[in-house]
């Protein structure tokens, strides 16, 4: 199996369909959340909607970078989410996230093993492989947060 296929499968596992590492995945967790739960604030934690937006921001931005060779996202904007005021807004956010998750995994699967070792946009960002592995770790980190917040607000 190509390394990129293996990594794409790991992305799909955390984002869309896996249970091996965390016994859940982002898609599964988000489908259990109502829009009111998604925007419910617990202390100083981010909301589930904000975390979903944040993950989608990076998936979309890095996917765009892979497609265009230009990195056009900035960390400072990664939580600049438009208001989620109803179920339609929440559904659009989750649909966009899930679509970008699959497109990102599909794009990674297309990358050759040689390209995985090449610089991601600029050498200062490391290799394509390092950035995809970082995305996987980033997604697991926020999946854990989403899962815990969902448990804290289960009765809302």
Predicted regions and their residues:
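Acidic/histidine-rich alpha-helical segments that form the ligand environment
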Residues: 84-118, 130-135
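Short, contiguous alpha-helical
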Residues: 2-5, 11-30, 35-80, 121-156
């Amino acid at each position: 199996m190509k390394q990129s296929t293996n990594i794409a499968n790991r992305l799909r596992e955390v984002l869309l369909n896996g249970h091996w590492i965390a016994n859940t995945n982002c898609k599964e967790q988000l489908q259990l959340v109502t829009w009111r739960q998604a925007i419910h604030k617990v202390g100083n934690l981010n909301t589930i909607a904000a975390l979903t937006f944040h993950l989608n921001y990076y998936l979309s931005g890095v996917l765009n970078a892979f497609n265009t060779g230009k990195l056009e996202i900035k960390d400072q904007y990664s939580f600049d989410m438009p208001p989620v005021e109803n179920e339609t807004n929440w559904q659009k956010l989750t649909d966009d996230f899930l679509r970008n998750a699959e497109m990102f995994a599909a794009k990674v699967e297309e990358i050759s093993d040689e390209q995985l070792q090449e610089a991601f946009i600029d050498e200062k960002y490391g290799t394509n492989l390092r950035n995809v592995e970082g995305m996987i770790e980033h997604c697991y980190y926020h999946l854990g947060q989403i899962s815990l917040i969902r448990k804290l607000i289960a009765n809302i």
